[in-house]
Regions:
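NAD(P)+-binding Rossmann beta1-loop-alpha1 motif at the extreme N-terminus of oxidoreductases
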Residues: 1-62, 82-88, 92-93
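Beta-loop-alpha module in the N-terminal Rossmann-like domain of NAD(P)-dependent dehydrogenases
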Residues: 66-79, 93-95
Length: 95
């Protein structure tokens, strides 16, 4: 399965590692380019923007959010603006 992860803090990064270990293809995005680069070294596909991340996914797309509460709504709306019917947002942000 191909899945995107937005938010590569401790929880998001560890989830990406588990998904990769289980054989999933992960496309990752974070405001910290360092966090993206670290996971690229572990097998993830990095993206420098939300649009680039979505563009690297095949339909139907699945985007997982692992974000702090303060920005969850804003980022969820931004992601939704790039998606089509049939795509999925998985929100496990801290609220």
């Amino acid at each position: 399965m191909q899945i995107a992860m937005v938010g590569l803090g401790r929880m998001g990064a560890n989830m990406v590692r588990r998904l990769i270990k289980a054989g999933h293809e992960c496309v990752v995005y974070d405001v910290s380019a360092e966090n993206v680069a670290a996971l690229e070294k572990e097998g993830a596909i990095g993206a420098g923007s939300m649009a680039e991340m979505i563009g690297k996914l095949e339909a139907p797309r699945a985007v997982w959010l692992m974000l702090p509460a303060a920005i969850t709504g804003k980022i969820a709306r931004e992601v939704a603006g790039h998606l089509q019917p049939g795509d999925t947002i998985i929100d496990l942000s801290l609220i």
